[in-house]
A protein has these predicted regions:
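Switch/communication elements of ASCE P-loop NTPase nucleotide-binding domains
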Residues: 1-49, 249-387
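Conserved P-loop NTP-binding catalytic core
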Residues: 41-100
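Flexible phosphate/Mg2+-sensing switch loops adjacent to catalytic phosphate-binding sites
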Residues: 49-75, 285-296, 328-329, 334, ...
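Short glycine-/polar-rich loops that comprise or flank the Walker A/P-loop
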Residues: 74-79, 102-106, 138-142, 298, ...
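Electropositive, glycine-dotted interaction segments
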Residues: 78, 84-189, 428
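Flexible glycine-/small-residue-rich
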Residues: 81-83, 146-149, 235, 249-251, ...
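Extended helical coiled-coil dimerization/tether regions that scaffold
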Residues: 151-158, 164-303
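RecA-like P-loop NTPase motor core
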Residues: 327-328, 341-344, 348-457
């Protein structure tokens, strides 16, 4: 099961009906700034409850507002998702979402009015446009990682600790068994035993410190008003115990003493981001092996700019692992990026190109109709430098290095009379792409379909 198509209207940059087709497994969304990549991610988040941050609240800025003088903000927006490749269990679970054409779809309609304190949300599906049951929606797990991630905060101890969430998933089966038996989980029993030893043993001075506090309290307010005190490491409850745990790091995998591990606030931003993402992927791998509706039937992982704080080698390794995770677990992974490293590290069919416009245009490169020979050539040809063609506003394909150097200089002469900021190809967002040969035919159909560019081939 995966989301094969998303349709948006009236939401952010999407003033008119906009449709993007997505891949089963990994989708990498590329394009220039302001092309609508974040808008697609935000539209998906409107449909589901984010397991990291909860429901994505509707904001006034979510309603489209054009830039022309006199444009008014949209009074409503619509988001629809189409699901494909459902197995039998998924078909049964989401049967109520089938429309008259037997397509499984989820629809959201949000309206705003000046007299309303907050927008009205209508989430519906199926032939009868019935309201979606929360229990059914909870079968879809959505995890969103924003571009500016505070990985250290997410990995710190506390009620929202990512480490605690992972441990609860790992121990879920055992916790249910001990709850039915009326017994303590081994971790809880061990902590209780340790806390009892601390409180009662004279060797640690804990007992003495607690007695001093208790005596001072009784002297201050009297025995009839005083409260009992006890010094221990944690409350004897599984959730509280795992929420108090801290994740530490050491810079390599060599065998070291535990005292050499350090707090994550001493680690690099890039590695903290990797540890955070690794904890999420570990949970997804684990849940994929537990055929339990409580773990969700479908998982959606949305990551904006996974390249944040990572050098090129780590970017490539991370994206490969994301692709492997999608294939092994059935998780649908949707990534947005401005990294030519990531864009060149995936096959062409995984890429969706976004072009700025009113509305933006999304092109799934797998549907550009390239012959197999051309597709194989483009996949081999794209590298970190040449994948710039996926992000440029305009393109100039040239045969060799001489043209790549000469044409931008000629453009400066032609454009010198233009206002400042429009006097070079770079100013205009145009890239000269050196093909190192006369391979134009492999690229013209790709670019014509995705960006409708004019072209000249000698």
């Amino acid at each position: 099961m995966y989301i094969s198509e998303l349709t948006v209207e009236g939401f952010r940059a999407f003033n008119q009906p906009f449709t993007v087709k997505l891949n089963k497994g990994l989708t990498v969304m590329v394009g220039e700034n302001g092309a609508g990549k974040t808008g697609v991610i935000s539209a998906l988040r409107q449909l589901f409850v984010d397991s990291e941050a909860g429901r994505y609240a509707v904001d006034d800025q979510d309603f489209h507002l054009g830039f022309a003088v006199g444009d008014a903000r949209a009074q409503s927006f619509k988001v629809s998702a189409t699901f494909s490749a459902l197995d039998m269990a998924e078909k049964l679970a989401f049967m109520a979402w089938e429309d008259i054409d037997h397509n499984t779809k989820l629809h959201l309609h949000v309206e705003t009015r000046e007299y309303r304190a907050r927008p009205k949300r209508s989430l519906w599906a199926g032939k009868t446009k019935a309201t979606v049951e929360p229990e059914v929606l909870d079968l879809i797990r959505c995890i969103y990682l924003p571009p500016l991630r505070d990985a250290e905060e997410k990995l710190s101890n506390g009620s929202r600790s990512r480490l605690a969430k992972l441990l609860k998933v790992i121990c879920k089966k055992d916790l249910l068994k001990h709850e039915d038996d009326g017994t303590d989980h081994p971790l809880v029993a061990k902590v209780k035993e340790f806390n009892k030893e601390l409180a009662e043993c004279d060797d640690y001075e804990i007992k003495k410190a607690n007695a001093l506090i208790s005596d001072s309290l009784k002297k201050a307010i009297g025995e009839s008003l005083a409260q009992g005190t006890r010094i221990q490491f944690s409350e004897s409850d599984f959730s509280r115990i795992v929420e108090s745990l801290r994740l530490l790091y050491f810079p390599d995998l060599s065998a070291v003493d535990t005292s050499q591990f350090r707090s994550l606030n001493e680690n690099s931003l890039g590695y903290n981001n990797l540890i955070y993402i690794a904890s999420i992927l570990a949970e997804l791998h684990l849940e994929s092996k537990l055929p339990d509706q409580d773990n969700g039937l479908f998982h959606l992982l949305l990551i904006e700019e996974p390249e944040a704080h990572l050098h090129p080698q780590l970017q490539t390794r991370l994206l490969k692992y994301l692709a492997d995770t999608a294939q092994e677990t059935g998780v649908q992974v949707i990534v947005t990026t401005h990294s030519t490293v990531l864009a060149s590290a995936v096959p062409m069919h995984a890429i969706v190109h976004m072009t700025a416009g009113a509305p933006p245009v999304a092109t799934r490169l797998a549907e550009c109709g390239l012959p197999d020979k051309s597709e194989r050539f483009v996949n081999r040809w794209l590298d970190v430098t040449k994948s710039n063609l996926l992000f440029a506003r305009g393109l100039m394909f040239v045969e060799g290095i001489a043209e790549a150097i000469l044409l931008p200089e000629l453009a400066k002469l032609v454009l010198k009379a233009q206002p400042i900021g429009k006097q070079t190809l770079h100013d205009l967002g145009v890239s000269a792409i050196n093909l190192n040969g006369i391979y134009f035919k492999h690229f013209m159909q790709l670019r014509n379909v995705s960006m409708n560019l004019k072209h000249l081939v000698e």
